[in-house]
Amino acid sequence: MKKQLVNMKGTKDGFVLRLDDQCAYSDLVEELKKKVLEGGIDGKVDVQLYLGYRYCTDEQIDELIHIVQETEQLIVASVQSEVLTVHESNQKMIESQQDTYLGVVRSGQILRSSGDIIIVGNVNPNGRVEAGGNVYVLGKLKGIVHAGVQGNKEAIIAASQFEATHIMIADQVEAMSDEHVKEINQAEMTCAFIGYDGRITYDQIHALKNIRPLLNVSKGGS
């Protein structure tokens, strides 16, 4: 039985077109053309192209999108790949680096790191910390923190005492009121992260093992 090189699966948001990542590119193109011409679709539908571990040039991706959208019913909403571009790979390497700062981040001071940063000390009101990765404050966090400044939505902010005025993770921003600080300021170290709903949420630090399991692996924890 001939192996299917293109599989189409329906989802609540439209369709996912899974493209074989082992076959010759020319064979994939031919089967994709046949698949999208099968018809049976009413109206316009969003499609996600999933390339798996196949590396495609920009020109090849444009060609695949063009083939799918020739039908007019199918609209490519996104292209997903497990292959990192050089830029993405470099960015991950930068974000995996870790800096340690011993001391107080004072009012008006800005502390920056391209990767993770561990602060052993307090972040005073109007002190600011910016990091490409995660921010850990082993002390009182009373200033402003931006984790994942390059858009890393997996970044977290953790502090022994969480009293920040503003926190940002990737493109999400939250101003914290006194009431909010009282609600989240547990006896244990508190962390902030982007939850499943796309909003900043809070939990105790021990919950990170379930919330960000890869964080535990990447830092060599147990």
Curated annotation (Swiss-Prot):
Pfam families reported for this sequence: MinC_C, MinC_N_1
**GO terms (BP aspect):** cell morphogenesis; division septum assembly; regulation of cell septum assembly
UniProt feature coiled coil, ranges: none
Q: What InterPro entries does the annotation carry?
A: CAP/MinC_C (IPR016098), MinC (IPR013033), MinC_C_sf (IPR036145), MinC_N_1 (IPR055219), Septum_form_inhib_MinC_C (IPR005526)
Keyword Cell cycle found: yes
For whether the record's keyword set contains Coiled coil, the answer is no
Instruction: List the transmembrane segments.
Output: none
Sorted UniProt keywords: Cell cycle, Cell division, Septation
Q: What does this protein's UniProt record list under function?
A: Cell division inhibitor that blocks the formation of polar Z ring septums. Rapidly oscillates between the poles of the cell to destabilize FtsZ filaments that have formed before they mature into polar Z rings. Prevents FtsZ polymerization.
Q: Which NCBIfam families match?
A: PRK00513.1-3
Q: Matching PANTHER family, A to Z?
A: SEPTUM SITE-DETERMINING PROTEIN MINC
- Describe the family membership recorded for this protein in Swiss-Prot or TrEMBL: Belongs to the MinC family.
- Subunit (UniProt): Interacts with MinD and FtsZ.
Q: What is this protein called?
A: Probable septum site-determining protein MinC
